[in-house]
Amino acid sequence: MLWPAALVAMFALAARAREIDNVTCSVVYGSNVARISKDYWLAQEGSLVSFMTFENDDPVYFFMGRALGTGASGGKYLYRVTRDNNTNVSHVQTSLFIPEHFNGGILLDMGSNYTHDAETDPEFLNARYLVVNDTEDSVREETLGPCPEMLRTLDVSGRTTLLYPSRYLHARDRMQVEKTMDTAKCVSTSVNLDATVVFSVDFPFSERAILRVTQTFYPDDRPQKHLLYLASQGGKTVHYSEVSATVTPLPGGNASFNVTIEFTDQPDDTTIHLWVSPKGINDDPDAVSAYYILNSLSSYDDPYAHEEISCDSVYQNIVMVLGSVVNITSPDPLPRAPDYSYPTDDPAGETTESAVTWLEATAQTADEATTPLAAHATDGYEPTTAAATLSTTEDLTQETSTPTVTTVIDPTSGAVTTESRTTEGTAANVATTEAAGTEGQNQEATTAGGPTNAATTLGHQTIEAATVEDSTTTARAAEYPTPTTTTVEPRPAGGTTIEDPTDSPAIEDTTTPTTTAAKVTALKTAAAEGPTPCVTTYTGSDTEAAQSATSISDAVTPEDLTPETTTPVDWSVTSTYISVADGTSMPAPTPSAVAHEASTTPAPTATAVPTSHTPKPQESTSTPSRAPTTGVAPVTANSLSPAATSSERIVILNTATASSGPGASTGATTAPISPPWSASPAGDGVTTSAARTLEPSSTRKAVAAESTTAADDVATSELGSGDYGDHATEPPRIVITNPPGITTLHDADAAEEDPWPTRPLYSVNIVNATLTANGMLTATCMAAAKAKHAITFTWHVGSNMVPAITGPPEPGLMFNGNRAWSSRLQTVEYGISPSARLACMACTVPPAQRYCAHDVAVVARHDRLELDMQVDVATVSVVCSGLDGVESEPYFVWTANGRPVPLGSVRTKRIPNDYGTPARWQSAIHISRFFVPAGHRDVYECTATLASGETIKATKNWSNTDYLALQKNAAARSTFVVAGGITAFAVAELL
């Protein structure tokens, strides 16, 4: 049996320790409602017991405790330790309910006889690889032969892993954290540790309460964490061998006692975290009683300062402590106390706001703008992203080389060529460029390989990949030795031409050196001369509209890493009406123009890639077998959204500027401010969104400007010729972009200093949007926010505000310490328009300062006998729905990755609609996995057979980029590689 490559690679990231020969490795299969149990018999009482799980290459949960004698039975705790009175040995029973998101996770069980030496060298008992499969009716475990080498050379104590503090808290700890914020007592104490200090606090404590003490210190500004003490029973004194700390509970009444922590000769700049739960290990979680921070500063004048603080201010610290009680050696600096204050443009903190009002408020002039876009340098980025970890000037100025990819379309033949050349950049630029590669054209255009690519794919940046000296620059450049040119299938005549501002036929590099060494020398010389603007202009063929989309960015140099001033940037866009009836297109009127403020902080070179377009993973296709699809395929919300949309993108509103191409306008047109969704469809055409996006420059992310064409996004049918002025053979380019937008910016300095996420609202996405033939419009708006924030939603259909009739939004799925909120829209769209334009704005509510983000979508009217497939996050299912008005129950057959899904796993029901519209049919199966390894894709197919014998089929692709669109955080940007996550219906393919 072969182990997945991702699993072996994950273990390669762990620190090496001595080889342990007696490791047992197994694969556990079970459903997410089953429980894993395993017994271990340890040699004597007091043996050390440890437990760790991995998810997405992160330590999800780590527990290190001691056999405490006879333990209470029952409960939901992961471990139960009991005593066999006859043999006088400790019996450890692991008991774990299988969470679905642990699919592909690793459980490491270990224990040892308790001696002073053996405590730091526990015996590795078992490694278990989890496979969550709903078709399993019980838990079964298959023991493997010899374990992989990496498994046998792990540091089993987990104390020296090169992994970041986990963002994936176990449900027990997560619930306690959420309940902490309103009930806990948080205290900060500063002391001078030049001498012995006794630190005493009082807090409620029951006999079976949990007391956890961790220490964080910062050698070379890199935090390391140690578990000092963990007790689950009062009245005992426990010494931990490797640290000079003693925790002594002293009787102090029925409901409380005094904890004394004594430190001697501790390293300077040390933080002690003391976290208390009022209930025992076998009780359901209730609330955190107290959280104490002890800061040791050798230069502190006052020998003792005790201050009660807001728990909100240390929320991330609490999360870090609970999620990483192992020894963590971070490859990059992390802050100790993130600031959770959010600037706002709305001091009153109202809970609702018109989208138009917001857009007017944020359209500042250059003189008024004081908050540069660079404020998003680290917003929402967990430390596993390169942009977050390489946050200091020292890291960002490390020299590396990265390939720049340019795609050129020949205006005559329509042939597409992709040229890759090596340019100078930063380490963060290299890492984030490769991490941002998505399935489709961008991923194909990005040159693969290199140590940074490998590290970023796994969600980690090794020190070797992040720290690149001058001597290694040539070696890294050698990985991309010469420019490569790839010619893809020519497009029909009338393609789009990429031109530079001087009307040159194509972007060419006539000065590229012929050798790698010469290239490196030339690039260093060019970098020393300062940033050079790179302007790529898309030119359409309509003389009157003369619309073009211009992407402007500067090359990044170390001297230009700090945002200073802001200047207005004009963007030009192209919109086209597409006739659903016959597939013809015509240019849309010139869109309204708005000058939006953008930071002058140079962004990485952004090269336009507007040509070959692969259908995005989220696209859902429905093909009735009764007749071939004709005309233009329906444009769905999913097909209009970028494959990996990011709420970090700032919406640059409609701006018409002069273009240097043929038939260009000679001036810019400015119109009153309007939201990107304000234009209503005209006639029988679909108005494409005229919004462009500008990536925040200081995220150091090289962004490929997205562009699609009618042949790509509307289907393979040909467009009509139409009348396009002097260029009748070239239909105008069609831009279809629906990026979400951030409405509130943060202070740039605070963002640069805090690579931990400081944004309460990560993303807003419109999903599952449908418009039936009878006008029933439904959609769901998903917003991912930090768990302590509540969210309100505002819906717009066209330019009208529409309330969500299903009631207030309800919180939903928890992931990565965040909560997914959702609001459902259900209304009737009158008229015969073939599409509807939706907008959803989500805002945090008081007492937190308000923070808003929005998403827009265009949904096409469905034929009544079509099927639409969506992924339902709340139920973790793939849902196939449609067949409006069909009376007899259809027969649904499902396949996952080409393999049939058992009929017992298919759920089919009839969904009645309101407003007198016909009922719909819905069939669903449980999704086999949320996390899909990079380069893989799960394909679900739903086939409905009607009573007449007619069959209708729909397919849905699910990949890591689809999950990225939902999650929007660091782990998502690391392409969500799970250690060989296994599809429920295709286990044999990966094992």
From Swiss-Prot:
Keyword Signal among record annotations: yes
Bias (Polar residues) ranges: 414-425, 542-554, 617-628, 658-667, 686-710
UniProt keywords, alphabetically: Signal
Disulfide bonds: none
Biased composition (Low complexity): 400-413, 472-493, 556-569, 598-615, 668-682
Signal recorded as keyword: yes
Region feature (Disordered): 332-352, 392-425, 469-511, 542-569, 587-641, 658-734
Signal peptide: 1-17
Protein name: Uncharacterized protein sORF2
Organism the protein comes from: Psittacid herpesvirus 1 (isolate Amazon parrot/-/97-0001/1997)
